[in-house]
Amino acid sequence: MSHPVEIDPILLSKVSKPARYVGGEWNSVVKDHDAVKLTVAYCFPDVYEVAMSHLGLRILYALLNERPDVAAERVYAPWPDMEEVMRSQGYPLFSLETKTPVRDFDMVGF
Protein backbone atom coordinates (compact mmCIF):
# COMPACT_ATOMS: atom_id res chain seq x y z
CA MET A 1 0.00 0.00 0.00
CA SER A 2 1.25 3.47 -0.77
CA HIS A 3 1.52 6.24 1.75
CA PRO A 4 -1.71 8.17 2.27
CA VAL A 5 -1.87 11.86 1.49
CA GLU A 6 -1.52 13.81 4.72
CA ILE A 7 -3.58 16.96 4.47
CA ASP A 8 -2.44 19.83 6.65
CA PRO A 9 -5.42 20.78 8.86
CA ILE A 10 -4.50 24.45 8.57
CA LEU A 11 -4.75 24.27 4.77
CA LEU A 12 -7.97 22.29 5.01
CA SER A 13 -9.44 25.02 7.21
CA LYS A 14 -9.04 27.44 4.30
CA VAL A 15 -11.50 25.64 2.02
CA SER A 16 -15.23 26.33 2.12
CA LYS A 17 -16.43 22.80 2.96
CA PRO A 18 -13.59 20.74 4.45
CA ALA A 19 -15.90 17.86 5.39
CA ARG A 20 -15.94 16.92 1.70
CA TYR A 21 -12.37 15.68 2.02
CA VAL A 22 -12.06 14.03 5.44
CA GLY A 23 -14.15 10.86 5.00
CA GLY A 24 -15.21 8.61 7.85
CA GLU A 25 -18.92 9.00 7.24
CA TRP A 26 -21.45 6.34 8.18
CA ASN A 27 -21.44 3.26 5.88
CA SER A 28 -18.05 4.06 4.39
CA VAL A 29 -15.86 0.98 3.96
CA VAL A 30 -12.16 0.95 4.80
CA LYS A 31 -10.10 -2.14 3.95
CA ASP A 32 -6.42 -2.92 4.21
CA HIS A 33 -5.06 -2.75 0.65
CA ASP A 34 -2.49 -5.42 1.47
CA ALA A 35 -5.27 -7.86 2.42
CA VAL A 36 -7.17 -7.70 -0.89
CA LYS A 37 -6.42 -8.79 -4.46
CA LEU A 38 -7.83 -5.70 -6.19
CA THR A 39 -8.03 -2.04 -5.24
CA VAL A 40 -10.48 0.16 -7.13
CA ALA A 41 -10.60 3.95 -7.23
CA TYR A 42 -14.27 4.55 -7.92
CA CYS A 43 -14.36 8.07 -9.33
CA PHE A 44 -17.26 10.45 -9.81
CA PRO A 45 -16.61 13.48 -12.03
CA ASP A 46 -18.31 15.99 -9.73
CA VAL A 47 -18.14 17.22 -6.16
CA TYR A 48 -18.98 15.15 -3.08
CA GLU A 49 -22.54 16.45 -2.60
CA VAL A 50 -23.57 15.64 -6.16
CA ALA A 51 -21.91 12.22 -6.09
CA MET A 52 -23.45 11.15 -2.79
CA SER A 53 -26.93 11.85 -4.12
CA HIS A 54 -26.28 9.44 -7.01
CA LEU A 55 -27.95 6.12 -6.20
CA GLY A 56 -25.95 4.17 -8.79
CA LEU A 57 -22.68 5.19 -7.20
CA ARG A 58 -23.82 4.03 -3.77
CA ILE A 59 -25.08 0.70 -5.11
CA LEU A 60 -21.88 -0.11 -7.04
CA TYR A 61 -19.71 0.97 -4.09
CA ALA A 62 -21.60 -1.43 -1.81
CA LEU A 63 -21.50 -4.29 -4.33
CA LEU A 64 -17.76 -3.97 -4.89
CA ASN A 65 -17.02 -3.80 -1.18
CA GLU A 66 -19.17 -6.85 -0.43
CA ARG A 67 -16.40 -8.87 -2.03
CA PRO A 68 -13.72 -9.75 0.52
CA ASP A 69 -11.01 -9.61 -2.16
CA VAL A 70 -11.86 -6.07 -3.38
CA ALA A 71 -11.35 -2.66 -1.78
CA ALA A 72 -13.29 0.08 -3.56
CA GLU A 73 -12.75 3.67 -2.47
CA ARG A 74 -14.48 6.84 -3.62
CA VAL A 75 -12.81 9.73 -5.42
CA TYR A 76 -14.54 13.01 -6.21
CA ALA A 77 -13.62 16.14 -8.09
CA PRO A 78 -12.34 18.78 -5.68
CA TRP A 79 -14.08 22.16 -5.50
CA PRO A 80 -11.95 24.96 -7.05
CA ASP A 81 -10.74 26.16 -3.63
CA MET A 82 -9.46 22.68 -2.71
CA GLU A 83 -8.05 22.18 -6.20
CA GLU A 84 -5.98 25.33 -5.68
CA VAL A 85 -4.71 24.03 -2.31
CA MET A 86 -3.90 20.63 -3.82
CA ARG A 87 -2.00 22.13 -6.74
CA SER A 88 -0.07 24.61 -4.59
CA GLN A 89 0.95 21.93 -2.08
CA GLY A 90 1.57 19.17 -4.64
CA TYR A 91 -1.22 16.92 -3.33
CA PRO A 92 -2.33 14.27 -5.83
CA LEU A 93 -5.98 13.39 -6.34
CA PHE A 94 -6.77 10.92 -3.54
CA SER A 95 -9.47 8.60 -2.25
CA LEU A 96 -11.84 9.61 0.51
CA GLU A 97 -11.50 6.48 2.65
CA THR A 98 -7.72 6.10 3.05
CA LYS A 99 -6.39 9.20 1.26
CA THR A 100 -4.55 6.93 -1.17
CA PRO A 101 -3.39 8.67 -4.37
CA VAL A 102 -5.47 7.56 -7.37
CA ARG A 103 -2.33 6.53 -9.25
CA ASP A 104 -1.70 3.80 -6.65
CA PHE A 105 -4.93 1.85 -7.25
CA ASP A 106 -5.01 -1.28 -9.40
CA MET A 107 -8.06 -0.05 -11.29
CA VAL A 108 -9.73 3.32 -11.85
CA GLY A 109 -13.41 3.38 -12.75
CA PHE A 110 -15.95 6.11 -13.51
Language model: regions and residue ranges:
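A short, structured N-terminal alpha-helical element that caps or precedes a catalytic domain
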Residues: 1-110
